[in-house]
Amino acid sequence: MGRIYFATTNLKKLKEIRSLFEADIVHMNIPMVEIQASLERIVDHKLNQVVPCIGEGDAVIVDDTAVAFEGLYGFPGVYIKDFLRIGSRKISEIVGKIGNSNATAFCCLGIAHYRDGRVVKKVFFGELEGSIVESKEDGLEGFDYIFLPSGSSMCLGDMPVDEKNRISHRRIASKKLADYMASVGIIKAHGS
């Protein structure tokens, strides 16, 4: 098997993905155009942009995330990156005024690889139930510091990496992806 790439401009995500897989993940630093669509269509569009960069035997992984606030009927969803521009403290305030802090974090991981000379694309989802809590400070990167997983006493961003990697939405999606990769010979099966 060739190389396994993770296409992202986010070095924090790259580090997290590398910690989730028992394989050598090569960084593919390619800015991608993000369309406004469903999580699955966004990931498929990203895959279409990076497939020309890989060769026979290689694989490339992309990802996207969404956060659905129950009190806002699923908003911001895939627009979470734009919504975060107002700051984590403001998001906490908005959710507090609505009176329903329930939220679901979603991760969609996509993989493209060649099989018998043809590109094969697959997507895998992970979701994590939780709630939005008051921000300790503003300007924190991402939603991890205001997202409290159900049954946890710590926000995702406050957890030690190994604990976060056991429960996160990205972990759930990456487990499904790793199982697929092992089933088609991209990586060795766990324990092999």
Swiss-Prot record:
GO terms for biological process, alphabetical: deoxyribonucleoside triphosphate catabolic process; nucleotide metabolic process
Annotated catalysed reactions: ITP + H2O = IMP + diphosphate + H(+); dITP + H2O = dIMP + diphosphate + H(+); XTP + H2O = XMP + diphosphate + H(+)
CC cofactor: Mg(2+); Mn(2+)
CDD domains: HAM1 (cd00515)
Main function: Pyrophosphatase that hydrolyzes non-canonical purine nucleotides such as inosine triphosphate (ITP), deoxyinosine triphosphate (dITP) or xanthosine 5'-triphosphate (XTP) to their respective monophosphate derivatives. The enzyme does not distinguish between the deoxy- and ribose forms. Probably excludes non-canonical purines from RNA and DNA precursor pools, thus preventing their incorporation into RNA and DNA and avoiding chromosomal lesions.
Lineage: Eukaryota, Fungi, Fungi incertae sedis, Microsporidia, Unikaryonidae
Primary location group: cytoplasm
HAMAP family, sorted: HAM1_NTPase
Binding positions (ITP): 8-13, 46, 64-65, 81, 141-144, 164, 169-170
Keywords of the record: Cytoplasm, Hydrolase, Magnesium, Manganese, Metal-binding, Nucleotide metabolism, Nucleotide-binding, Nucleus
Pfam families tied to this protein: Ham1p_like
Free-text comment on the cofactor: Binds 1 divalent metal cation per subunit; can use either Mg(2+) or Mn(2+).
Entry's Gene Ontology molecular function annotations: dITP diphosphatase activity; ITP diphosphatase activity; metal ion binding; nucleotide binding; XTP diphosphatase activity
Similarity annotation: Belongs to the HAM1 NTPase family.
Full protein name: Inosine triphosphate pyrophosphatase
Quaternary state and interactors: Homodimer.
GO cellular component, one term: cytoplasm
EC number: 3.6.1.66
UniProt subcellular location: Cytoplasm; Nucleus
Top class in the EC scheme: hydrolase
Positions bound to Mg(2+): 34
Gene3D superfamilies found in the cross-reference section: 3.90.950.10
